[in-house]
Regions:
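Conserved class I S-adenosyl-L-methionine
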Residues: 788-797, 814
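Conserved SAM/SAH-binding beta-strand->alpha-helix loop
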Residues: 819
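Conserved loop->alpha-helix
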Residues: 379-418
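Class I SAM-dependent methyltransferase Rossmann-like catalytic core
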Residues: 749-786
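Nucleic-acid 5′ end/cap handling module spanning
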Residues: 60-65, 158-167, 226, 322-384, ...
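S-adenosyl-L-methionine
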Residues: 831-898
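Phosphate-end processing signature that detects enzymes handling 5′-triphosphorylated RNA
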Residues: 4-7, 11-323
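Conserved SAM-binding loop of SAM-dependent methyltransferases across substrates and taxa
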Residues: 798-810
Length: 904
């Protein structure tokens, strides 16, 4: 169902319901919007707006984002400003001017409270600041330095022969053109005198505006781009209150507005814009410029075309039976993400391990500093880009090659070269569909003795050779370059013939090119792709799901100093207000104290998918679930970052020093100068040389992810927990440029080999043997143990014998294993299994698990592989401290449990 939205006097939009032909102001017309626009401009010009009037101003405005389906975002705000600057528009004050607009209520003739069509406006930050001290407009007017900062403005519709002049809605492009009059009302007016006298007893709504205005000598137009904070809402309306504090206007979430307004001083006789036709040409061009900024392309298209392109994309993935009415989410972006490359992914090959290793059947390419997009060639040959937020960009490029219609490629859009010049290069690094044919299951690169003729890299090169792109505008040059990325090695050597050497040679070749400045664009690392596997798959010929996912076999490498994590920032609060802590220094007055905020760093976590955050610590601390506890209904949620490898329970707590913004307000800033606040997703780097809790450094605000979160488009909380853990591990145990270029001087990862063997090796080959083993073990435990006895399990693995321990009605089990992953794995490790069984069984033995070598002496601690394991083992045998705070309540409960040994 379609709705129309009316602009309130507050400047906000109110949904009024389905379009109704009887609605006078926004009635749907059978006349096309371009024709209505012509008529509107003619009426506007006929009113002689260029004739100066001290009190009345004729306004012809274009407002964007009016359809209500897609609110403007910070990304839109920044993108439009960049586009305007690139087109020669300039701004006198890029910090913007400040306005506080207030809309008061009054009693109408029927005795009902109604919002007045006269707004009160305060301009200038200092005047606004002064008003907020008293919330008394009369007091502000009485101040000589601020009295000229206040004005009262009446906004009204325009009539032509008693007929209201309607707005013109361009719904397909999400903007509206309106013609209205503004009249400044004198402070001596009886209405204004009454209002100001009763100001403090009158309820009002507020809009706090930071407005930047861009102009161009060739256009009679002001481009107003605003950041707006408003009063609390009651449904669709702004709530009326007496003061700004009650309204919450300065703490509420900001919204963005973009408007064009004709500058009446630049039109009329004697100017270049002396008739409606010349004004229309300039207006249409300016509208196109804004749409270019909003859509990130010089070829903006309608909302209908964008929607059709997305629906065609979804049909390509899911078939013609796909329900086109389904909402499309960022999870529908099917290009898989990569894990951070770890030491274990580059160590010498070990047949006893099944960890993905780039030494065996991998190719490498440079990681361009661009934006990830899918390139979709439609069934008519139009070429679109789809970004990770599922926004559609028409490239202005078409192809006549019908064999490539309905095809889908993956790549990076690189807008500028290293000198900042616009190159608009789309670098293709994978292909998923060709002419509706799903090619994701094919291998990526050919093997030197392989007779296959189809592999994805060859398909990319062949497709781009026959693409013959051209501009949608006749006789215009192709607006976007489309090229295949270069991968190394181009032919994969057979196993044993130097395949592990060639991958490091490829890395060295790329990194040498980077050092010598031979890449046209900026790079920030390397990407490793399995040579023979299907996209997202875990074996040759298999593919992953048609959804957003992280591919376990795809890796990215960045120089260690560029390893970062995206966190959701949550400020610590007291009574609903952010806690601000002063840093006291001798000889410094209180007004000059440095101040900081303490923030929590959170990332997305799903217990079902990611397991427990730190299951063994939960066991040690006695944080055990009870029988009948259910999975959290909110499966994916933001949780405090408490990494386990290396373990740091306070890694997710961070202090951020505050700095003054342009208005003198103390704010948190990223390294690139952006303000961020509570409920914002920010990219952080980690500096281990700094003091604890000061090591995380905010470097960049992720406006794309923050927009997704705040608009409810998707559950985006920064990096997923497992990705953040992977990056954390890489930060502390980095793969250096020397390692990745040579394959030498790589440290051992002793103790982790079985992690990957257990995780990745298929179990069906050993199923029969394991069944027999379990049968024997079950009978042994049942035969020798009695109810309430204790048991020690050497090399306990992942506690697969838990059902046997439960059936034997044991009271306590002490498990030892050399593999930390067997014990600590968040999903199926021994501790996680213990916690899961607690939910489903009423009676279950208590258990503790420690990391140790069962072939050595356990009781004296020499078998243990870390200090925590030594401490726990001593406690179980009745030695060492009994302090609950030191041991953890779960360990303290079992103190001395095995002082006389174990029963079994």
């Amino acid at each position: 169902m379609s709705y129309y939205y009316t602009r309130m006097s507050t400047g906000n939009f109110k949904r009024r319901g389905p379009y109704n032909k009887n609605d006078k102001q926004h009635a749907e017309s059978k006349v096309a919007p371009p024709i209505l626009l012509n008529r509107l401009v003619e009426r506007y010009y006929a009113s002689n707006p260029h004739v100066k009037d001290v009190t009345t101003n004729h306004e012809l405005e274009v407002k964007f984002g009016t359809k209500g389906v897609k609110p403007l975002t910070k990304i839109d705000y920044d993108s439009v400003i960049r586009k305007l600057k690139s087109l020669g528009f300039s701004c006198v004050n890029e910090q913007g001017g400040y306005l506080l607009r207030m809309y008061y209520e009054h009693l109408d003739k029927s005795g009902q409270f109604k919002e007045s069509n006269i707004r009160t406006e305060i301009s200038g930050f200092r005047a606004i600041q002064e008003y907020c001290k008293s919330n008394d407009i009369l007091k502000l007017i009485g101040m000589e330095e601020h009295m000229r900062s206040v004005k009262f403005v009446k906004k009204s519709r325009v009539y032509d022969n008693d007929e209201m002049v309607h707005d013109v809605n361009f719904n397909d492009f999400n903007f509206r053109v309106s013609y209205q009059k503004e009249e400044e009302i004198s402070m001596s007016n009886i209405i204004i005198r009454n209002v100001t006298q009763n100001w403090t007893q009158t309820k009002k709504s507020f809009r706090y505006i930071n407005r930047v205005t861009f102009t161009h000598d060739d256009f009679p137009i002001n481009v107003d781009i605003s950041i707006v904070k408003s009063s609390h809402r009651e449904g669709w309306d702004l709530k009326k209150t007496y003061t700004t504090d009650e309204a919450g206007v300065f703490s509420n979430t900001e919204v963005y507005e973009i408007e064009l307004e004709l500058d009446n001083s630049k039109i009329g006789p004697g100017t270049r814009f002396s008739n409606p036709e010349s004004i229309l040409v300039a207006l249409r061009k300016a509208i196109k410029y804004i749409l270019m900024g909003l859509q990130s392309t010089n070829y903006p298209v309608s909302i209908v075309e964008q929607k059709t392109a997305l629906q065609s994309y979804m049909k390509l993935l899911h078939g013609e039976s796909y329900d086109v009415e389904k909402r499309i989410y960022p999870k529908n972006f099917i290009g898989p993400s990569s894990y951070t490359l770890q030491i274990e992914n580059i160590i010498p090959l070990d047949d006893n391990m099944n960890v993905p290793n780039i030494r065996r059947n991998y190719v490498v390419t440079d990681k361009a500093d661009g934006e990830r997009h899918l390139m979709y060639i439609s069934n008519t040959g139009k070429i679109y880009l789809i970004n990770t937020n599922m926004n559609v960009i028409f490239t202005g490029v078409i192809t006549d090659e019908k064999s490539l219609f309905n095809s889908l490629f993956d790549g990076e859009l690189i807008l500028h070269n290293k000198s900042g010049q616009f190159i608009n290069l789309f670098a293709v690094f994978d292909v998923y569909y060709i002419a509706k044919d799903d090619v994701r299951a094919l291998g990526f690169m050919v093997e030197n003795d392989d007779q296959k003729t189809r592999y994805r890299y060859q398909i990319i090169k062949t497709a781009l050779n026959i693409l013959k792109p051209k501009s949608v505008i006749k006789d215009e040059g192709v607006p976007m370059r489309i090229e295949a990325k270069k991968f190394y090695p181009e032919v994969i050597a057979s196993a044993g013939n130097g395949s592990d050497v060639s991958i490091f040679a490829g890395c060295k070749h790329i990194l040498t090119k980077v050092e010598n400045g031979l890449f046209e664009y900026n790079t920030d690392g390397l990407i490793f792709t399995p040579a023979f596997m299907g996209v997202g798959g875990d074996a040759i010929g298999k593919t992953g799901k048609l959804t957003k996912t992280t591919w376990e076999y795809s890796f990215k490498w960045k120089p260690p100093q560029y390893n970062t994590i995206d966190f959701l920032v949550v400020t610590t609060k007291k009574n609903g207000e952010d806690i601000i802590t002063p840093v006291f220094q001798e000889g410094v007055t209180s007004s000059d104290f440095n101040e900081y905020k303490t923030i929590e760093l959170r990332c997305g976590f799903n217990q079902r998918a990611h397991g427990y955050i730190n299951p063994c610590q939960d066991v040690y601390d006695d944080k055990l679930p009870d029988f009948g506890d259910k999975e959290d209904d909110e499966q994916y949620k933001p949780v405090l970052f408490r990494p386990s490898n290396p373990y740091d329970p306070e890694a997710g707590i961070c202090n951020i020093m505050l700095k003054k913004d342009d208005t003198g307000v103390m704010q948190m800033f990223s390294e690139d100068g952006e303000v961020f606040e509570d409920n914002t997703i920010v990219e952080f780097k980690y500096d281990m040389t700094r003091d604890h809790k000061w090591r995380w450094i905010p470097i960049h605000v992720r406006n794309d992810k923050t927009t997704e979160l705040r608009q409810g488009v998707s559950l985006n909380f920064g990096n997923a927990y497992h990705v953040a853990e992977s990056n954390w591990k890489s930060i502390h145990n980095p793969v250096t440029q020397e390692m990745i270029s040579t394959g030498v001087n790589i440290p051992d990862v002793e103790g982790d080999a079985d992690v990957y063997y257990n995780r990745l090796v298929s179990s069906n080959k050993t199923m029969g043997l394991r069944n027999f083993h379990n049968f024997i073990k079950y009978n042994l435990i049942k035969a020798v143990s009695k109810k309430g006895e204790t048991l020690i399990d050497y090399a306990c693995g992942k506690a697969g014998d838990f059902p046997k321990w439960i059936d034997a009605q044991l009271s306590f089990v002490f498990g030892i294993d050399k593999s930390k992953d067997n014990l600590e794995n968040r999903i199926d490790g021994a501790c996680a299994r213990f916690l899961n069984y607690r939910k489903s069984r009423k009676h279950i033995p208590y258990a503790l698990f420690v990391n140790g070598d069962s072939s050595l002496n356990i009781r004296n601690g020499s078998a243990m592989l870390n200090e925590k394991a030594v401490q726990i083992t001593k406690a179980v045998f009745g030695e060492g401290t009994k302090d609950v705070a030191s041991l953890g309540a779960g360990v303290a409960r079992q103190f001395g449990k095995a002082v006389d040994g174990f029963n079994v």
